[in-house]
């Protein structure tokens, strides 16, 4: 050997014991022989190989079952590994190998450990030279320990080591909790490197290293204040008791202290332990133990009397009571031992218990399945019995299970049909109701779905509800996810509506209040008297004064050349006026109600406009006058208050629309009606007798009057919201001469524009719309214009001037553009002949004949001669008669000379002339249309005055003789007789044959549906279309347009279906309000049921033109056709040809302003529609 020793190592047992069990300690001179036997002197391998370690293996063989149990470092006998002796050197670098995890946090922080309690796998070869495993080999201090001490430590029982070990928790050196248990050895000690069988317990920490759950010092720190108080309290006597009955038993024991010997337990007080409170019983000094001198216990002897107790105090110290009371009347809300919160600190937090507070409940009672399992038994403990669930039936007291759900997260465009199709897969549905915004009527993205309950089986419907809730995870509606929640009473839907309304109210802009005007000067106000209208107002102002509140502003304080109506509108723009009119004596400002009138008067009276002060007179609307027919026709629906920009834009658009309507009416529609009403096309109609010469105005005079007077486009009897009634004024021209000026000639545009009326599809025939180009095409217009023949001689009896005037005002609504043209487009044979004859004319002749006639006159030569004969009789007092006196420029010059000395008034001459001529226009039209009824002789009063005769009732039959609308009711309209009466009636069939044919047609369609697998558009054709009667719409004597029967209709026959756009009730209400604001006087809304309305205002058939009558000829019924509700008009009696169709609107009865006058004129007329 290296040290010169020839002794071989003695083999040892499996636990490190020697084979001979002699345990003879080695000679001191031989220490370290084992180390030098296998290592070189430089403490390294020295280039040795595995063969050099074979002697060591023979000296310390492993047990026989080494290979049987796996062997190696990770087997049963890992300590016998041949390289295990080298692993002992790095015990401080790797965690110890142990069976259980003693310190998990320590092992988790060790980055070198991959397996808790195990070393990572090593290479089978020795570690490299100079590795860290041998860094302690160079330290001589680890090899100076005696081998006997090593053997003793190795063979020592672990329990003895635990017994002799120091208490690390109590020792100051081991107070640190993060102390590594593997560093328990002194720094100078190192284990022997060649110890073949080191003790496994060497690397194990002692059991005292475990941290105690409850330590004495923790208890002391937590209850330090309590213990201090108790100790102080123990030194003082308790307070006196209230009575003797409630005396503590501990006091009785102290009173009988000399009856028997007290048991001494040292310093422990038995009374304190029994009672559990140191406050109730005072502590006494312990009795000393008597011990005999011989060391044996002696019999008990009498004890000397105890020293007297200190006198009792009447009251405790204040600080003691505060300390004890705070602890006894409080409860612990924060325990630092149970929850570690750095913000709350390490001390407990107490809360004072108030009187009358609710007792503390066991938190386990809130959890029905709370239980404590036993760690010793694997058997599942018995839980609480399940509560039985009973099925709902008629005898159940509890409410039924929920069957309604609310679907959220939907798109606002999602319809109820889509939701129905989706949730039908979960069960049969009873109702699907969309949650709608009450303000707009649109969906808010939610829907209520209720499952159907059949035969009181609520459980089945509830199961469908559960399926729908479970299906929301994967289901989608319109490619979007949705949420489903039970909502039996609809409370969640109401909450959604409230949130939507609150959001809309929040977004709404606050209404700006009108600026407060500065107070006017009272001195000036007192000086200005209340103005009074002096002149007679215009008809329009007079009519508005009857039905509206208004303010009159005197014109004598406001010069007309400096203040205009636009200035008044600008100053009063913040108030709710709807019209401002300028009259001769001042301005009239009209309001809808008295409140706006009072506000305007109080704020603006005395204010200055362009430097001039306003003097106002307020006239309130005290009583609403009963509406007459004329007032009903002139009443217009006023738009709501708008901002100034919106109002200006609306006014501009309205004026442009009125101008456009006027141009279309005068240039397009007039020409179309002229061509359509060509007398050549109505030769079979009876001609009216020619008017007398006294009633026929002079053609030249009328033309001259139109030169200085603007063309009237508005009538006082206008009915807003409907198409104008075009009338023909037949005016003869017996004094027409060739010397008439070319300047006064009226050109008539003759372009046919029948397609303008055809804005919507007719219900009788399918036709495509005809559009009017924006930029007119001259060539196309010229081609469409009918070219007239040149006439060599025109008889005076046939010469006429077609003057067209509209009975509508400038407030005509869109209804004018929505009238259907159900008239057939056919070409007149006469027009074709004229076109063929005109093809030979040159271009100049075509243009001349297209736009006007060539009058028979030539330029005059020489001195001027009178062109017309003077009209005999006195001078006329009307504007037209006065204009008739002026024939030419010479007459105008003479008139000017005659009026030189008269100072003209400062008025607008054109407006004044137009107003006065416009007053009698309606009467002139009636006289021109019915000249024989203009002055009926049947009711000429003998006295010459109607006032002198008094009031008398005129019979209904007599009214039909002279009233125009009554006469129209009795006499069929001639325009309905346009059809060729020469057509043979061989194809006519009675109503019974028609019904039979219709039934056969319907049966054939149903048979084809059954034969074909799929339905086509042809089979889905509306069946009612084939059953309708031939009807036409035309001007009605009752109101605007009406529907007329072309052929006789028998009673109880179906006439036509009321077709329109099907909308909900909420949408219908909004549309009705919009129609009224836009000026559409009539809205064609027909209610089908409580939630469905048919709107035929803009999309509908000609059935919407049926008027109301108190004695109707038709009735409306709602029938079902293939599951859909239809509105059908049936004949209630036999209807003759060309008779107007009417039915009762059946409006609800109302009173006051809401009543609508009835214009049917029937003998049984009620007077009002409602």
From Swiss-Prot:
Region ranges (Disordered): 1-382, 625-646, 687-843
Record-annotated SET domain positions: 1029-1146
Bias (Basic and acidic residues) ranges: 17-188, 198-226, 242-276, 316-325, 337-365, 731-742
SMART domains reported in the protein's UniProt record: N-SET, PostSET, RRM, SET
Domain named Post-SET: residues: 1154-1170
GO molecular function terms listed in the Swiss-Prot or TrEMBL record: histone H3K4 methyltransferase activity; histone H3K4 trimethyltransferase activity; RNA binding
Chain ranges for the short sequence motif RxxxRR motif as given in the UniProt record: 995-1000
Annotated keywords: Chromatin regulator, Chromosome, Methyltransferase, Nucleus, RNA-binding, S-adenosyl-L-methionine, Transferase
Cellular compartment(s): Nucleus; Chromosome
Biased composition (Pro residues): 302-311
Top enzyme category: transferase
Compositional bias segments (type: Polar residues): 278-294
Reactions accelerated catalytically: L-lysyl(4)-[histone H3] + 3 S-adenosyl-L-methionine = N(6),N(6),N(6)-trimethyl-L-lysyl(4)-[histone H3] + 3 S-adenosyl-L-homocysteine + 3 H(+); N(6)-methyl-L-lysyl(4)-[histone H3] + S-adenosyl-L-methionine = N(6),N(6)-dimethyl-L-lysyl(4)-[histone H3] + S-adenosyl-L-homocysteine + H(+); N(6),N(6)-dimethyl-L-lysyl(4)-[histone H3] + S-adenosyl-L-methionine = N(6),N(6),N(6)-trimethyl-L-lysyl(4)-[histone H3] + S-adenosyl-L-homocysteine + H(+)
Ranges of residues in domain RRM: 403-489
Entry keyword annotation includes S-adenosyl-L-methionine: yes
Function: Catalytic component of the COMPASS (Set1C) complex that specifically mono-, di- and trimethylates histone H3 to form H3K4me1/2/3. Binds RNAs which might negatively affect its histone methyltransferase activity. COMPASS recognizes ubiquitinated H2B on one face of the nucleosome which stimulates the methylation of H3 on the opposing face.
Family: Belongs to the class V-like SAM-binding methyltransferase superfamily.
Self-association and partners: Component of the Set1C/COMPASS complex.
Name of the protein this chain belongs to: Histone-lysine N-methyltransferase, H3 lysine-4 specific
Taxonomy of the source species: Eukaryota, Fungi, Dikarya, Ascomycota, Saccharomycotina
């Amino acid at each position: 050997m290296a040290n010169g020793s020839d002794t071989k190592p003695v083999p040892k047992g499996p636990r490190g014991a020697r084979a001979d069990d002699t345990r003879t300690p080695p000679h001191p001179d031989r220490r370290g022989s084992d180390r030098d036997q296998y290592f070189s002197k430089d403490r390294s391998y020295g280039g040795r190989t595995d063969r050099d370690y074979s002697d060591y293996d023979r000296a310390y063989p492993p047990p026989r079952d080494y290979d049987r149990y796996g062997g190696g470092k990770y087997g049963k006998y890992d300590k016998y590994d041949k390289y295990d002796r080298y692993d002992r050197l790095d015990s401080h670098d790797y965690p110890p190998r142990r069976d259980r995890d003693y310190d998990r946090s320590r092992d988790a922080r060790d980055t070198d450990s991959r397996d808790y309690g195990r070393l990572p796998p090593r290479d089978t070869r020795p570690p490299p030279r100079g590795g860290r495993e041998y860094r302690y080999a160079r330290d001589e201090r680890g090899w100076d320990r005696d081998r006997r001490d090593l053997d003793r430590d190795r063979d020592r029982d672990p329990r003895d080591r635990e017994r002799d070990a120091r208490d690390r928790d109590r020792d100051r050196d081991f107070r640190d909790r993060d102390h590594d248990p593997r560093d328990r050895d002194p720094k100078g000690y190192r284990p022997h490197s060649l110890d073949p069988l080191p003790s496994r317990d060497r690397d194990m920490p002692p059991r005292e290293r475990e941290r105690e759950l409850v330590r004495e010092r923790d208890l002391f720190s937590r209850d330090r204040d309590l213990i201090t108080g108790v100790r102080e309290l123990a030194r003082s006597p308790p307070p006196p008791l209230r009575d003797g009955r409630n005396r503590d038993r501990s006091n009785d024991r102290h009173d009988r202290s000399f009856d028997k010997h007290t048991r001494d337990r040292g310093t422990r007080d038995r009374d304190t332990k029994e009672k559990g409170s140191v406050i109730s019983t005072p502590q006494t000094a312990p009795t000393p133990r008597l011990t005999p001198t011989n060391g044996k216990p002696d019999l008990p002897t009498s004890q000397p009397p105890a020293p007297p107790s200190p006198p009792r105090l009447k009251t405790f110290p204040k600080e003691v009571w505060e300390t004890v009371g705070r602890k006894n009347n409080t409860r612990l809300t924060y325990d630092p031992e149970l929850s570690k919160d750095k913000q709350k600190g390490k001390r407990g937090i107490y809360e004072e218990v108030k009187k009358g507070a609710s007792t503390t409940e066991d938190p386990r009672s809130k959890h029905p399945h709370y239980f404590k399992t036993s760690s010793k038994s694997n058997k599942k403990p018995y839980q609480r019995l399940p509560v039985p669930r009973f099925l709902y039936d008629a005898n159940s007291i509890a409410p039924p299970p929920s069957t309604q759900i609310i679907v959220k997260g939907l798109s606002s465009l999602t319809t109820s049909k889509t939701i129905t199709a989706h949730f039908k897969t979960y069960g049969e549905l009873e109702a699907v109701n969309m949650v709608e915004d009450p303000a707009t009527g649109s969906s808010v993205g939610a829907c209520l779905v209720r499952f159907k309950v059949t035969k009181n089986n609520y459980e089945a419907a509830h199961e469908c509800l559960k399926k729908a809730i479970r299906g929301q995870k994967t289901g989608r509606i319109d490619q979007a996810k949705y949420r489903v929640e039970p909502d039996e009473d609809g409370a969640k839907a109401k909450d959604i509506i409230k949130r939507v309304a609150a959001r809309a109210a929040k977004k709404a802009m606050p209404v700006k209040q009108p600026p407060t005007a500065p107070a006017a000067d009272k001195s000036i106000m007192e000086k200005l008297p209340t103005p009074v209208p002096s002149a007679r107002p215009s008809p329009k102002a007079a009519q508005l004064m009857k039905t509206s509140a208004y303010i009159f502003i005197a014109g004598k304080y406001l010069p007309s050349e400096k203040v205009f109506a636009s200035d008044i509108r600008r100053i009063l723009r913040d108030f709710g006026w709807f019209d401002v009119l300028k009259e001769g004596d001042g301005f009239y400002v009209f309001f809808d109600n008295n409140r706006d009138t009072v506000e305007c008067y109080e704020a603006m009276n005395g204010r200055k406009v362009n430097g001039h002060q306003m003097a106002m007179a307020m006239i309130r609307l005290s009583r609403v006058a009963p509406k007459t027919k004329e007032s009903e026709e002139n009443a217009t629906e006023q738009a709501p208050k708008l901002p100034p920009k919106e109002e200006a834009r609306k006014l501009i658009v309205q004026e442009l629309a009125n101008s456009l309507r006027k141009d279309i009416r005068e240039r397009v529609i007039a020409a179309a009606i002229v061509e359509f009403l060509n007398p050549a096309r109505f030769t079979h109609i009876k001609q009216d007798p020619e008017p007398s010469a006294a009633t026929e105005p002079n053609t030249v005079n009328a033309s001259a009057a139109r030169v200085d007077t603007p063309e009237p486009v508005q009538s006082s009897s206008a009915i807003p919201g409907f198409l104008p009634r075009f009338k023909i004024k037949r005016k003869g021209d017996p004094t027409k001469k060739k010397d008439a000026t070319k300047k006064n000639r009226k050109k008539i545009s003759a372009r046919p524009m029948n397609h303008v009326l055809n804005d919507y599809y007719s219900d009788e025939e399918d036709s495509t719309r005809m559009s009017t180009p924006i930029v007119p095409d001259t060539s196309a217009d010229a081609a469409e214009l009918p070219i007239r023949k040149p006439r060599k001689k025109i008889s005076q009896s046939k010469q006429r001037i077609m003057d067209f005037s509209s009975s509508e005002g400038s407030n005509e609504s869109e209804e004018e553009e929505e009238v259907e043209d159900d008239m057939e487009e056919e070409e007149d044979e006469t027009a074709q002949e004229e076109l063929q004859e005109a093809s030979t004319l040159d271009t100049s002749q075509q243009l001349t004949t297209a736009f006007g006639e060539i009058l028979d006159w030539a330029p005059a030569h020489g001195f001027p001669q009178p062109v017309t004969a003077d009209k005999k009789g006195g001078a006329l007092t009307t504007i037209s008669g006065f204009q008739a006196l002026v024939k030419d420029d010479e007459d105008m010059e003479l008139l000017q000379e005659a009026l030189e000395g008269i100072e003209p008034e400062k008025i607008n001459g054109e407006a004044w002339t137009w107003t006065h001529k416009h007053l009698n226009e309606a009467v002139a039209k009636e006289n021109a249309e019915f000249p024989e009824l203009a002055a009926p002789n049947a009711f000429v009063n003998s006295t010459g005055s109607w006032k002198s005769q008094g009031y008398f009732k005129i019979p209904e039959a007599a009214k039909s003789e002279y009233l125009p609308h009554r006469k129209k009711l009795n006499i069929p309209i001639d325009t309905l007789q346009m059809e060729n009466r020469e057509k043979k009636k061989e194809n006519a069939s009675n109503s019974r044959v028609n019904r039979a044919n219709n039934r056969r047609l319907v049966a054939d369609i149903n048979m084809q549906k059954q034969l074909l697998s799929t339905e086509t558009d042809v089979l889905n054709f509306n069946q009612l279309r084939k059953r309708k009667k031939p009807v036409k719409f035309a001007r009605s004597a009752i109101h605007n347009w009406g529907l007329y029967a072309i052929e006789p209709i028998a009673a109880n026959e179906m006439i036509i279906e009321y077709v329109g756009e099907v909308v909900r009730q909420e949408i219908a209400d909004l549309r009705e309000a919009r129609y009224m604001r836009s000026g559409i006087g009539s809205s064609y809304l027909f209610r089908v049921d409580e939630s469905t309305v048919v709107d035929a205002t803009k999309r509908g058939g000609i059935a919407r033109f049926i008027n109301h009558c108190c004695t109707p000829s038709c009735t409306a019924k709602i029938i079902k056709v293939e599951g859909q509700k239809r509105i059908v008009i049936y004949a209630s009696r036999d209807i003759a040809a060309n008779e107007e169709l009417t039915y009762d609107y059946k409006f609800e009865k109302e009173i006051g302003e809401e009543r609508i006058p009835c214009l049917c004129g029937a003998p049984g007329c009620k007077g009002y529609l409602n």
